[in-house]
Amino acid sequence: MKKYKPSEEVDFVIIGSGAAGGVMAKQLATAGFSVVVMEQGAWGAYGHEQDYNKDELINRFPAEEDKLISDPKFQRNTFRRNANEKAVAGGHTYGCVVGGGTVTYGASSWRHLPYEFNEASKFGTMKGTGIADWPVSYEEIEPYYTQAEWEIGISGPNIKTPLIAPMSKPYPCRPLPLKSSGALIQKAAAKLNLTVTPNVAAIIAEPYNGRSGCINCGACSGYGCQVKARSSSAVALLPYAVATGNCEIRVHSYVREIAVDASGRATGVTYFDKANNNQEVFQKAKCVVLSANGTETPRLLLLSKSSRFPQGLANSSGLVGKYLMTGNGGGASGLFADPLNEYKGAVTGAAVLSYVPNDVKARGFYGGGRMTARGQMSPMQYGLAGPHGAPSWGAGYKKALIEQANRRLTMVNFISQLPVETNTVDLDPDMKDAWGLPAMRITTTSHENDFKGMQFFIDRSVEILKAAGATQVWADGINDSKGGAHARGTARMGNDPKSSVVNKYHRAHDVPNLFVVDGSSFVTGGRNHPTMTISALAYRCADHLIKAAKSGNVTI
């Protein structure tokens, strides 16, 4: 792998190696630019995926050196429901390894639907929210969705329905098997007149681009994939970036600041180098791409204060860190007479799409969501979560645990969350992280509309499980998110610098050679997992950035 000296001014520094950072690294390095990817995590099993460990203890309680996710002891954070509360220590985590969250995520990879880019125009706004149209349309992004799906490797159904975004090209791989959960949900759908399809996933169902197809081992969500079937940045993108000879991945590099000169241009990044006793190092760069995720990205911008940017970098609008969206839950669990064997295969096999569209009049709330059925939990997860309707310990607990462990199915739903300005990521004035910097503080309470949506999906989950033949059903309580893996909206894109942080090509309004490329740029949250849209937007940004750099619009 190419190695650059910190004193050597590279064309691009990319902060983060996940869904967006991996795309940016591959595209920019392939175009001939010099690239350094700053990753605060370790290598993981990069290049040696067969060494990923399936041990539940290691994956649930990872050792510092082997971790795949961030550790709240080091990447400390706090949480509160509103600005009047005192924040307490939080448990927010994210992917912290080469490949970021794509190494361990469940890999659902649906596109946004066309109307999700112009909801304000199509459906109107709502009091107390920041609902607005995106500065880009689905038609502009569609070619990049296709590019992402084919280069990364996506499995999914090739069917046409208004409930799925129109595609110029089918998915490259056939769908993953439906499993017992899929068969049961199809049974319910036939009774309830619902549309069910196989899930769209960044897990290849068959050999693709030199990688093995999924072997249905069951050590899926939360684990690294030993056969490279999960299309993470670590296997589908970064090896190609490194192979160009233009890209260095620099691990254990904790970026603390994006530096700027007197004219307001980014000049590089200052980071703590674990390999050098955590000494501060400055890496020079002509352009900085920030792809750290929807919570660490705004935190780093706020940490990068200077006399020119006293409110934080790229924050003349005052919106950095605001409009945080994470995705709410709310579902139900059902017990079935026969064993389900859901421990096999990918975590999600089937999806209910009927409630994706917006239908305020019929449902009483703004937004929608996609419903999935899952039974995959490891023995340790079952033991810690506990059986439903049973004592919390003793013989009754053990009996219920044995009875339910392989016969329980849970509806897990991804529901739209409206952008609210007071839902924020900022700097905690009291807590410091392991490097002595202000810790991340998350403040979030869902809009009252979202609580209505959560209750709607809880009720629908109960209906579906009963129709599927569940002998017992337990409804979840409303789960108002405390932050999570799908953070977005905290550096929103737009045409007006007064009401957005970056433009339609992810260039910061205030800093001409700073690009924010991850879920932070989302304007509205969407009804599906955000990763495929993050990837498509990154391909679009890279395309623009390469053309701009070669034409002199970005000085490289």
Language model segments and positions:
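A conserved FAD-binding loop/helix module that cradles the flavin
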Residues: 524-542
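Residue-level detector of alpha-helix initiation sites
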Residues: 18-19, 295, 521
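FAD cofactor-binding and catalytic pocket of flavoenzymes
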Residues: 78-101, 105, 110-111, 116, ...
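Beta1/beta-strand and adjacent pyrophosphate-binding region of the FAD-binding site
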Residues: 4-20
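Conserved redox-cofactor binding core of oxidoreductases
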Residues: 61-71, 76, 81, 85-88, ...
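Conserved N-terminal glycine-rich FAD pyrophosphate-binding loop of Rossmann-like flavoproteins
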Residues: 42-66, 95-108
